[in-house]
Structure formats: C-alpha cells, structure tokens
C-alpha cells in the first residue's frame, strides 16, 4: 500500500512537470559520516554513526519555491555494541532557494515523513521531521553542486518504550534539472 502511494505521488509530480511551465529536477545527497543519538524512555541512551544517502525529485511550483519527495538510505553502527542497523526513509519536502549571485545560491528545506529502522530481525517505524540548510554552485542552467547541513528528529511509540532519535550530518550533493 505504501509503495503504491509513493509511486502515485512521484507520477503526479512527473505529470505536473510535463503539463506546466514549472521545472522538474533530481537531487542526490551523500554524507560519508553521519552522527545519530537515540534516547529510550527507560533511560538508556545510545550513540551511533554511519553514512547517509538521499535521492529525490523536486518540482519548482513558483519562483524558487519547490516541493519534493526524498528517499533516504542510512546505515548506522552503535558505538557501544557490535550491532548495525539500516534506516530507509521517505519524506515529503518543501524548500525555498535564493540567489546570492548568478552562480551561487542558498536553499532551505523542511520535510516530514516516515523512517523504517531495521535492527537485527525487527522493523520499527519512526515519524520523522527534518531541516536542511545549505547552498551550492550552479555550473550550468541544469547542473549544480550542493553542500549543507541536514538535521533530523524522529519519534517512535514502541510496544515496550517510546524512543526519540536525533541525527545531524554534512551533506554533499548534486542537482540535475530536467
């Protein structure tokens, strides 16, 4: 069901980009070292580190206002245990960009979504909120390089305990306009 909803949203964005004067682009970001901390209601606190990769589609709806969808893949390893876990995330985002010069720009994005955390044989769903702030250099009208800071917060209401997580990382990426 979730897969059908995501595919439908992506197809709607593609249809809108073909039907109007707006602009459609693909954005990919990577962080080789991401830090995350998890606090569990029972008082336990865990720190982890790993990589973060995001890919998504953006649609320019007005001036520099964009809407988009991101899919992220994170692999974290607990610092205190010999255990790693995989996080797959889906976020709907709204962003705004501004130009400093013809080639240099800034951008800010805010997103809401769902993170699915796979720890050993268990899967956990976490509601997530994220903010990205950064900028970039426009090589051509269609190709840009970006760098920025991505901060994410998640909350999970589990069967045994509630947990919150906080992640921060430096993202390097590219935008390709279609």
Q: Where are these predicted regions, by residue range?
A:
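Cleavable N-terminal export/targeting peptides
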Residues: 1-25
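Short glycine/proline- and aromatic-enriched beta-strand/turn motifs that initiate or cap beta-hairpins
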Residues: 18-79, 165-178
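Outer-membrane beta-barrel channels and translocator barrels
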Residues: 21, 60-64, 99-103, 138-144
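Residues on the lipid-exposed face of transmembrane beta-strands in outer-membrane beta-barrel proteins
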Residues: 30-32, 53-59, 71-73, 90-96, ...
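Sequence/structural signature of outer-membrane beta-barrel proteins
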Residues: 31-41, 72-81, 99-101, 113-121, ...
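Helix-adjacent hinge/juxtasegments
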Residues: 81-105
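A charged, solvent-exposed segment within the mature domains of Sec-exported extracytoplasmic proteins
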Residues: 119-162
């Amino acid at each position: 069901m979730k897969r059908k909803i995501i595919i439908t949203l992506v197809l709607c964005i593609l249809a809108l980009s073909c039907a109007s004067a707006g602009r459609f682009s693909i954005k990919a970001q990577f962080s080789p070292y991401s830090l995350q901390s998890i606090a569990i209601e029972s008082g336990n606190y865990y720190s982890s580190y790993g990589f973060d990769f995001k890919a998504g589609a953006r649609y320019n709806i007005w001036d520099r206002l964009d809407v988009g969808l991101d899919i992220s893949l994170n692999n974290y390893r607990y610092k205190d245990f010999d255990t790693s876990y995989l996080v797959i995330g889906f976020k709907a985002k709204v962003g705004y960009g501004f130009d400093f010069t013809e080639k240099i720009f800034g951008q800010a994005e805010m997103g809401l979504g769902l993170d699915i955390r796979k720890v050993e044989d268990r899967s956990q769903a976490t509601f997530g909120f994220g903010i990205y702030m950064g900028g970039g250099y426009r090589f051509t009208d269609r190709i840009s390089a970006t760098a920025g800071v991505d901060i994410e917060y998640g909350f999970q209401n589990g069967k045994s305990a509630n947990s919150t997580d906080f992640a921060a990382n430096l993202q390097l990426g590219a935008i390709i306009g279609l």
